[in-house]
């Protein structure tokens, strides 16, 4: 049994994200998620961005936006944004 997060698109091996989406890397394994750009305006997601800024500044090791939280926390937060 699984659950579906319609706002999160399945990450592919492609470097580019579709128009209106942004690739982020999450968790210890740096799993790639492709999320709607509209999430950037949500207060709960902005909290994650603040954490990312505090931990990484503007130097993100994966070349894209790295979110310093577990995959479970990220999915729980983004699930509420859908």
Curated annotation (Swiss-Prot):
Statement: the UniProt record of this protein carries the keyword Manganese: no
**Which terms are listed as keywords in the entry?**
Auxin signaling pathway
What induces this protein's gene, according to its Swiss-Prot or TrEMBL record? By auxin.
InterPro entries from the UniProt entry: SAUR_fam (IPR003676)
What superkingdom does the record give? Eukaryota
Q: Some GO term, biological process aspect, for this entry: which one?
A: auxin-activated signaling pathway
Q: Does the keyword 4Fe-4S apply?
A: no
The UniProt similarity line reads:
Belongs to the ARG7 family.
Q: What is this protein called?
A: Auxin-induced protein X15
Protein's organism: Glycine max (Soybean)
